[in-house]
Amino acid sequence: MFAELAPYLSNPRQTLAQILNFALVLSTAFMGWKALSVYTNSSSPIVVVLSGSMEPAFQRGDLLFLWNNSPRAEVGEIVVYNVQGKDIPIVHRVIKAFGTGDGGKKSQRRLEKEADKRSGPGLSSPISHQMLTKGDNNIADDTELYAQGQDYLDRKLDIVGSVRGYIPAVGYVTIMLAENPWMKTVLLGIMGVMVMLQRE
């Protein structure tokens, strides 16, 4: 292997060109991801299902495509949300939704009470639309999964996006990389060597 690398190591200019080529590939992928994020208005426009809580609708390893430009999430809609303080996306279905003017005065009081908890004294309320979620394969709703003191999800603060499409099983690669960190290093190493060995 070192014998194959020797010609490139002896030619710094060509080696630098190959390194820049590899950096270009990575930066192009990054810019593509950012562009997709802006278009979908989602910080994570593509996510992978990590558990079986949404079976049979989605299986572990399915790749989901999200859209986050709708002001509301209706009952029955499948959304992806992040729990405050955690960075693990959860894919579950909306089973209750509360919005301004919906559900009567009782629901509105619940919204205002939750807004006070979330925004704190002296801050304007960011609450616009709230919902309760549940996994199709779960017995109970997601109240126990939410942050301490949180009864509902807020559309603007917690929701990453609504599911608009999916590809089965493709995300298993991501799960394998997450569960085996050493595989990331090996994969990046292989990609780097392949780029370095490309002849112009």
Swiss-Prot record:
Residues 1-15 are cytoplasmic. NCBIfam families: sigpep_I_arch. One of its GO terms (cellular component) is signal peptidase complex. It is found in: Endoplasmic reticulum membrane. The keyword Transmembrane applies. Residues 34-200 are lumenal. Residues 186-197 are annotated as: C-terminal short (CTS) helix. This is Signal peptidase complex catalytic subunit SEC11. Keywords: Endoplasmic reticulum, Glycoprotein, Hydrolase, Membrane, Protease, Signal-anchor, Transmembrane, Transmembrane helix. InterPro entries: LexA/Signal_pep-like_sf (IPR036286), Pept_S26A_signal_pept_1_Ser-AS (IPR019756), Peptidase_S26 (IPR019533), Peptidase_S26B (IPR001733). The active site is at S53 (charge relay system), H92 (charge relay system), D142 (charge relay system). The gene is SEC11. The chain crosses the membrane at residues 16-33. Glycans are attached at N41. One of its GO terms (molecular function) is serine-type endopeptidase activity. The C-terminal short (CTS) helix is essential for catalytic activity. It may be accommodated as a transmembrane helix in the thinned membrane environment of the complex, similarly to the signal peptide in the complex substrates. Residues 103-119 have a biased composition (Basic and acidic residues). GO terms for biological process: protein targeting to ER; signal peptide processing. Catalytic component of the signal peptidase complex (SPC) which catalyzes the cleavage of N-terminal signal sequences from nascent proteins as they are translocated into the lumen of the endoplasmic reticulum. Specifically cleaves N-terminal signal peptides that contain a hydrophobic alpha-helix (h-region) shorter than 18-20 amino acids. It is an enzyme of class 3 (hydrolase).
